[in-house]
Amino acid sequence: MAKRILLLIVITAFTIASNACSKRTETQNNMTTTKSDPINISSFKVRTMDGQEKSLSDFKGKVLIIVNVASKCGYTPQYDGLEKIYEKYKDKGFEILAFPCNDFGGQEPGTNEEIQSFCKTNYNVSFTLFDKIKVLGNDKSPLYSNLINYDPAGDISWNFEKFLIDKDGNVVGRYKSKVKPESEELTTAIEKLL
């Protein structure tokens, strides 16, 4: 009997200690935040669709959504929601940085010109589209190699995964593809940062 009580006490103490050491805070089902050191994107340089190098430090002072996009994906209609929130918040210091990628089922096979034309014709996209990149594998872009370390760390799971960036360039949220851009969850988080 005494051994059982002692074993129960040890298991309970271990469980409490394990939970206390956890740095994660769960928020709904789609996003996890962490209290670890922030991941900052300001030092990264990316290419615009016309091949010009652009420093992400140019966006300091703005709230950002960084999103990997594709034209032939079940989530492609999210371009519409992205454009809606861009139009709603752009005058308050908000930008969307969209990075086409062809890593998931070949769903973005087009050239930069074809992608721009598709987005303008079908969704009247006016936010910034960047050069097509890789978000998976050994040759993934340096930006995404950094972004995927935000808790819950791990590779991008599909197109239209979103990262929320504060005005200082710190990653403060990660939203899976199923979270719509105009969802209350995402727009509330954006509004808190503006």
Role assignments for model-derived ranges:
Residues Y75-K140:
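Structural microenvironment flanking redox-active thiols in thiol-disulfide oxidoreductases
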Residues F59-V63:
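Proline/glycine-enriched tight loop/beta-turn segments at coil->beta junctions
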Residues E26-S57, P142:
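N-terminal "domain-start" segment that seeds a small globular fold
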